[in-house]
């Protein structure tokens, strides 16, 4: 019998796992209008506030006036514009690599890069808390897919030793884990990839523009950028735009151009997006960018400390992603609704995004948040958390 779609939707509702879209009005600043009222936005990845920055908007408008609204084709047909080449050259300089390649999204990047690098007879090692796009890329590759416990380097070493000689070996990790806000131990991963002759790929979607002295990401923070084979990141979080990139050797980029299906078979990014990304990189390199990173780091530390003092488990967060552990799905979503009523938009996170029993409020900080708004948010969370028996 054909499985009922209506029945499947009802089951999601009964399990507290049903999802729906909420429309917000205005730009992605620290405040938006949701359900007819202005609220403080605490779940955006617009970490530096660049999505509404005048420099990015001006660059996008000028690009549209000169180049039009679309690229017209995939990159290997006629869709490689001078803006693509200019952005990729800028990204390579930004990351200190020989070359870079842009993709249409972080999901498209990971689901295209990994199958281009490994296949049948090869092995890919993935942290158990890696992003879904990495998981799907590993599955699509048809390589042997080995998941190691989160940040457990002893377990990873045992698995590498077990599979030594099994073909090409690829280690893939998030740089900043998107649901916990903690960091991958990159120096230890570099040591293991050297010892076992593996490739190392780091998805730095949530570190690009934020971490490191000059905003180059988690690899810069740990001073291991030169030892990472592929540095992937996005243009749509701290950089305020849309799309993704990978920075690597010229040889690796050449292989991806020829093998990454999500790159080959997609119409390329449009002019406005490309120009805005270049403007964002310039801003990250400026004194203003440095000031924004410092303000973000300060706000994140104050917010995290205040939540911990209020009794919340912030799950080892070290970055601008600050989760507050709730536990089960129903109280997490009740918490979300109550906070919205109080004027704070925080999204509850449920399975399959996170493991069962670890539902949470995923709070994300922006450099443009007012400290007073963050203080009020913590007070509201503490009050509601006590009412729900969470703290």
UniProtKB/Swiss-Prot annotation:
The keyword Protease does not apply. CDD domains: KBL_like (cd06454). Keywords: Biotin biosynthesis, Pyridoxal phosphate, Transferase. The keyword Ligase does not apply. GO terms for molecular function: 8-amino-7-oxononanoate synthase activity; pyridoxal phosphate binding. The modification N6-(pyridoxal phosphate)lysine is found at residue 237. It holds the Pfam family Aminotran_1_2. Transmembrane segments: none annotated. GO terms for biological process: biotin biosynthetic process. Its EC number is 2.3.1.47. It catalyses: 6-carboxyhexanoyl-[ACP] + L-alanine + H(+) = (8S)-8-amino-7-oxononanoate + holo-[ACP] + CO2. Pathway: Cofactor biosynthesis; biotin biosynthesis. Homodimer. Belongs to the class-II pyridoxal-phosphate-dependent aminotransferase family. BioF subfamily. Catalyzes the decarboxylative condensation of pimeloyl-[acyl-carrier protein] and L-alanine to produce 8-amino-7-oxononanoate (AON), [acyl-carrier protein], and carbon dioxide. This is 8-amino-7-oxononanoate synthase. It comes from Geobacter sulfurreducens (strain ATCC 51573 / DSM 12127 / PCA). The lineage of its organism: Bacteria, Pseudomonadati, Thermodesulfobacteriota, Desulfuromonadia, Geobacterales. The gene is bioF.
């Amino acid at each position: 019998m054909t499985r009922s779609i209506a029945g499947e939707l009802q089951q999601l509702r009964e399990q507290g796992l049903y999802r729906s879209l909420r429309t917000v009005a205005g730009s992605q600043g620290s405040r938006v209008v949701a359900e007819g009222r202005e609220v403080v936005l605490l779940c955006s990845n617009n970490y530096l506030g660049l999505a509404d920055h005048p420099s990015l908007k001006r660059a996008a408008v000028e690009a549209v006036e000169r180049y039009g609204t679309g690229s017209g084709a995939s990159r290997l047909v006629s869709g490689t514009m001078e803006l693509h080449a200019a952005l990729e050259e800028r990204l390579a300089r930004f990351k200190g690599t020989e070359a870079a390649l842009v993709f249409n999204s972080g999901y498209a990047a990971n689901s295209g890069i990994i199958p281009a690098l490994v296949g049948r007879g090869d092995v890919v090692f993935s942290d158990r808390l890696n992003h879904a796009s990495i998981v799907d890329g590993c599955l699509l590759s048809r390589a042997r897919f080995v998941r190691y416990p989160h940040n457990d380097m002893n377990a990873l070493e045992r698995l590498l030793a077990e599979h030594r000689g099994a073909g090409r070996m690829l280690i893939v990790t998030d740089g900043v884990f998107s649901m916990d806000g903690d960091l991958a131990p990159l120096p230890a991963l570099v040591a293991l990839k050297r010892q076992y002759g593996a490739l190392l790929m780091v998805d730095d979607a949530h570190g690009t523009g934020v971490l490191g002295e000059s905003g180059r990401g988690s690899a810069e923070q740990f001073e291991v950028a030169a030892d990472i084979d592929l540095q992937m990141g996005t243009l749509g979080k701290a950089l305020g735009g849309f799309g993704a990139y990978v920075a690597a050797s010229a040889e690796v980029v050449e292989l991806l151009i020829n093998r990454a299906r999500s790159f080959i078979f997609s119409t390329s990014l449009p002019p406005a997006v490309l120009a805005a990304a270049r403007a964002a990189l310039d801003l990250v390199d400026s004194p203003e960018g440095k000031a924004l990173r410092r303000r973000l780091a300060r706000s994140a530390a104050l917010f995290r400390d205040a939540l911990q003092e209020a009794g919340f488990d912030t799950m080892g967060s070290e970055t601008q992603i600050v989760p507050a552990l709730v536990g089960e799905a129903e109280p997490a979503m009740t918490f979300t609704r109550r906070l919205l009523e109080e004027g704070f938009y925080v999204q509850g996170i449920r399975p399959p995004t996170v493991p069962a029993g670890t539902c949470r409020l995923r709070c994300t900080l922006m450099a443009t948040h007012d400290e007073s708004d963050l203080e009020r948010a913590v007070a509201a969370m503490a009050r509601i958390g006590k009412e729900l028996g969470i703290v």
